[in-house]
C-alpha cells in the first residue's frame, strides 16, 4: 500500500479566546476556530476577499499554551493533520466532525499589531 501524506499548514487569526474542554471520555483539549483570508482582484480590478474558517483542536502542552496566551484576533502559524472523528450527540445519534489536529504552533502576534 502506498504511503500517504496528511499535513495541514495554516496562518490565520483566532476567532475567540480558547478554553479547555473535555470529550465525553474525559480527555481534555482546546478547540479554536482559525480564519484564513484570501485576497485577489476581480476582472474589473476591484479588490475581493474571502474568509475560510478552520476548526482546530490542540492537546496537552500545546492546548495549555493556547489557553494561556491566545486571545481573539491572535495571529498564529500552525501545522497539523486533518482528522475526522465520530461522536454521539445528546440524543445518542452518531455524528462526524472533520478538524485539524495541531501538533505545532507559533504565535505571530495579535490583530492589533
Question: Which sequence ranges carry the predicted segments?
Answer:
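Single-stranded nucleic acid-binding surfaces, predominantly the OB-fold ssDNA-binding core
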Residues: 1-113
